[in-house]
A protein has these predicted regions:
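Extended amphipathic ligand-handling, pore-lining, and cofactor/metal-binding catalytic surfaces
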Residues: 1-152
Length: 152
């Protein structure tokens, strides 16, 4: 991945401080795995949370964060949606927002990765299915074993 590309882990956003703190923890873990910075950014709402509730660090939203990047001369972005599937936030709001930002910065380049579910409802992401099965097994080992035997 090109070092010039800014990578944003993007959720819908929330007024609950915990949501932003959890997004930051995921972004930090991903940064460590990738060996490059991944920044926690929300589509909406989180910028309204009092920074004192966020360890003194203000939350940001895509529009503000990309504008700050434009001002710093950056033009290339990757958005990693932290969404199970392509909600309206991803299929409707984000494209409109990006077109608005493109008017401000025509040379902007944006890559949007798939949502967690994958590219098609007909072929869900197998790793997500396995992760959910792990949760079932952890919550009820005996019941999960019965389910796993029946389902295979």
């Amino acid at each position: 991945m090109d070092a010039e590309i800014e990578v944003f882990l993007v959720d819908n956003g929330s007024l609950a401080p915990g949501a932003t703190l959890e997004l930051r923890a995921l972004a930090k873990g991903l940064s460590e795995r990738l060996g490059r910075e991944v920044e926690a950014v929300s589509l909406l709402h989180s910028h309204k949370v009092n920074p004192a509730e966020l360890g003194g660090m203000e939350a940001t939203i895509v529009k503000r964060r990309m504008r700050a990047s434009f001002a710093a001369g950056r033009r290339r972005f990757m958005i990693l949606p932290l969404f199970l599937g392509p909600s309206r936030a991803i299929t409707e709001y984000l494209p409109v927002l990006l077109e608005e930002l493109r008017e401000e910065c025509p040379e902007m380049e944006v890559v949007i990765a798939d949502c967690l579910f994958g590219q098609s409802v007909d072929r869900p992401e197998a790793r997500l299915v396995e992760m959910l099965m792990d949760h079932v097994r952890a919550a009820d080992p005996e019941g999960a074993m019965h389910i796993a035997r029946r389902g295979r």
